[in-house]
């Protein structure tokens, strides 16, 4: 029994362009257009899921996916740092930010810790591995990071060393309790053959 999970990061929005923690803003025009152009690159799946975030919902709609909410795949709750840049958080609470970046269990912003996020996403992956077929989900970049940490059996501080670009598809294939990872593939390009498209 093989399970294939494809996690798609959302397209560009102002928070990404300005390097801010997401604050619920919509996709910008370029991000929405790129997502629409990628609609035929996403293969049909037995189930299509989405993070509750606005930019994830809008990306899923632009891709033509008929999705249902999956709370277990929600993004990291940044508490009172929501909408701030890293520099702004550092200026307001330098010691708290340093602690957060150094300790996956820390949550000085009053939201969710990286440790809790990794546990939540890892639990969802464990459940997904009990089913066969193809799943696709549009999720926040930090969810892709957390899934990668779990699949590779990496320490949680490796979370910070994983980059996830906007509108990329990362595939995880699970069988007999073991996952394999196919690194993120950019969507919305026109210079790939059908065989190179994500999920092939």
Predicted features along the sequence, with ranges:
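GST superfamily/GST-like fold recognition
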Residues: 141-145, 174
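Glycine-rich phosphate-binding loop signature in dinucleotide/nucleotide-binding domains
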Residues: 42-44, 128-134
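Phosphate-handling substructures
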Residues: 63-120, 183
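Acidic, low-complexity terminal tails and accessory targeting/binding regions
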Residues: 1-4, 38, 76-88, 149-200
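Generic beta-sheet signal
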Residues: 5, 131-142
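Short beta-strand scaffold positions
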Residues: 50-51, 119, 138-139
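Active-site-proximal alpha-helix that buttresses catalytic centers in soluble enzyme cores
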Residues: 2-68, 110
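Conserved histidine-centered catalytic loops in small-molecule metabolism enzymes
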Residues: 42-72, 98, 173-200
């Amino acid at each position: 029994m093989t399970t294939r999970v494809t996690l798609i990061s959302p397209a560009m929005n102002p928070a990404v362009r300005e390097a801010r923690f997401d604050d619920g803003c919509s996709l910008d025009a370029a991000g929405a257009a790129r997502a629409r152009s990628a609609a035929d690159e996403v293969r049909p799946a037995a189930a299509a899921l989405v993070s509750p975030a606005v930019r994830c919902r809008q990306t899923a709609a632009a891709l033509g996916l008929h999705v249902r909410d999956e709370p277990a795949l929600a993004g990291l709750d940044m508490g009172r740092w929501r909408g701030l840049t890293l520099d702004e958080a550092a200026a307001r609470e330098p010691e708290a930010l340093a602690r957060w970046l150094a300790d996956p269990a820390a949550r000085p912003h009053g939201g969710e810790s990286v440790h809790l996020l990794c546990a939540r996403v890892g639990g969802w992956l464990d459940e997904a591995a009990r089913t066969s077929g193809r799943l696709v989900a549009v999720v926040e970049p930090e969810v892709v990071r957390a899934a990668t940490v779990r699949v590779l059996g990496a320490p949680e501080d490796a979370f910070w060393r994983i980059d996830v670009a906007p509108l990329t598809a990362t595939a995880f294939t699970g069988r007999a309790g073991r996952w394999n990872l196919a690194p993120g593939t950019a969507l919305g390009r026109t210079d790939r053959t059908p065989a190179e498209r994500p999920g092939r």
